[in-house]
Structures are given as C-alpha cells and as structure tokens.
Amino acid sequence: MKRLVVGLLAHVDSGKTTLAEGLLYRAGVLRKLGRVDHRDAFLDTDSQERARGITIFAKQAVLTLPAADGTDETELTLLDTPGHVDFSAEAERALQVLDYAVLVVSGTDGVQAHTETLWKLLARYRVPTFVFVNKMDLPGADAAVPVSYTHLRAHETSAHL
C-alpha cells in the first residue's frame, strides 16, 4: 500500500475544514457531513475550535483511495491545518511531513495576505502544491483572480528555485 500525507492550507475561512469533511464523506469515512457553523465538523474536535468556528490545532484523518487500475491502494493521511494567522506556527509545523499540499483559496475573497505567506512557506519547504479554488457556488465568486495570481506566483517561485 502506498502512503501519502496531504495538507490542506489556506487563509482563515477559506473552507479547508469543509473541504476535508467533504473528502472524508465521499471516501466513506464519515456517515454524515458535519459543518463548521453547526459545530459538528469531524476534524474540529476542541471546544475552543467549535466555539470560535475555526481550526486551532492541526488534525489528521486517514482515507483509502482505490487504484484506478485495481492494483495498489493508497492510504491518504489528510492534515487539516489552522488558517488564522495567530495559529500559523501550528500550520508551519505540519509542512515538514507533507508529501503534497492543497492551498485552498476562496473564490469570493480571493488571495489574502496569509495565502501569500503560506505560498512562500510551501516554496521554502519545497512541498508540491495544488491550488483549489473554493466557494465557487457563492455570489461574487470569481475563479479568474486566484487562478491568474497562482499562475504568476508559480512562475516567480520556479525562477527562485
């Protein structure tokens, strides 16, 4: 069995925990979808997290991905990290163990200051990164802003490596 560790990183309120919840639900790990705003998200277990509606401590969950060709499955450890700048040290600690990262960007809010910081940290730690534009179903969402930003930053980052 292959094993991968994938971290979800983003500016606060970009939807990391909700994305993790959806992935776990679709993989059959969860029987019901929880919600951060309902205080029943699977990965936000601490009472402070539930009261504030934000992730404070990095959490892990494991799901199994079947192989497309029916050979070897992949065990995926998903790390949901804090997005609030006050807890960025907790997110940075997780970078050392990641095989890949998913940088979540809100389609309604676009790239935020902490998104920039995370992008630079991911480059410094040389973590291969996917960008996921979230909240595209909400009014005011515009994928063009985060996508064009990501394209520009990817070229800048590769030029410095």
Predicted features, each with a name:
Residues 159-161:
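N-terminal low-complexity segments that are often proline-rich with Ser/Thr-Pro
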Residues 112-124:
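Amphipathic helical hotspot of TIR/SEFIR-family domains
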Residues 101-104, 126-134, 153:
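Conserved beta-strand/loop subsegment of P-loop NTPase cores
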Residues 150-157:
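Conserved small/polar residues in nucleotide/adenosyl-binding loops
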Residues 8, 132-139:
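Conserved short loop/turn motifs at secondary-structure junctions
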Residues 112-113, 138-144:
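Switch/connector loops and helix/strand junctions flanking conserved nucleotide-binding motifs
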Residues 146-148:
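Acidic, proline/serine/threonine- and glycine-rich low-complexity intrinsically disordered segments
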Residues 1-105, 109-111:
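P-loop NTPase switch module centered on the Walker A-proximal segment
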